[in-house]
Regions:
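Sequence-specific dsDNA recognition surfaces
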Residues: 11-38
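Basic, amphipathic alpha-helical recognition segments used for DNA target recognition
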Residues: 57-60, 68-119
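Short, well-ordered loop/turn elements at secondary-structure boundaries
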Residues: 2-3, 35-39, 63
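Amphipathic alpha-helical segments
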Residues: 75-83, 92, 111-154, 158
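Acidic, low-complexity, intrinsically disordered peripheral segments
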Residues: 159-172
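Low-complexity, Lys/Gly-biased intrinsically disordered segments
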Residues: 1-14
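Short, charged beta-turn/beta-strand-edge "cap" motif at the junction between a beta-strand
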Residues: 47-51
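A generic structural signal for residues embedded in beta-strands
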Residues: 43-44
């Protein structure tokens, strides 16, 4: 089904973002199913365990049961910082230690609750989050510039160099 509500599986999530889901569910049947909301951390618990992604906006999608929706109960830890720590080698090693399953790994919620998280001061967390935000901004900018460059190369081949240069000047304002 090409139309409908996107269904996010573990394979569709990574620490840098969400890939476009290949599976969509019927709007009518799944109308009332809960959707992930802004400031939620998606955390994989089955298959590729321990991948976290922080949502900066509400998501009109349904997630697999293999993905937990984590919400912050207090302000002691910033969600962006927690997501970064969840994706760190420190937590990956804990996940590898805890996860069981001979074919598909399963990380139990009770084990996830016991994960040790290094907690920095709020100021240090904020500094890290600001750097992380800049990193994502520059990553997105580089992707956009790369797309512009690809299009400009096609314009050089199809038309001429001056058309491509004009396009790049306009696109990078």
């Amino acid at each position: 089904m090409e139309e409908g509500i996107p269904f996010i599986r573990v394979a569709d999530i990574n620490e840098f973002g969400l890939n476009e889901p290949s599976i969509h569910l019927d709007n009518e049947i799944y109308r009332d199913v809960i959707r992930p909301t802004k400031n939620t951390i998606l955390l994989t618990k089955d298959g590729s365990v321990g991948i976290g992604y922080y949502l900066t906006e509400d998501l009109n999608a349904i997630t697999s049961g293999a993905i937990l929706h984590l919400r912050m109960k207090n302000d002691a830890v910033l969600p962006q910082y927690l997501t970064l720590v969840l994706n760190s080698i420190v937590v990956k090693m804990q996940a590898e230690r805890d996860a069981g399953g001979s074919i598909i790994q399963h990380w139990k919620p009770s084990e996830i609750e016991e994960v040790l998280i290094p907690i920095l001061s709020n100021e240090q967390q904020r500094t890290i989050c600001d750097l992380l935000e800049k990193s994502f901004k520059y990553k997105n900018l580089s992707i956009n510039l790369l797309d512009c460059m690809k299009e400009a190369v096609e314009m050089v081949v199809e038309y001429n160099e001056s058309v491509a240069i004009d396009f790049l000047k306009e696109a990078t304002k």
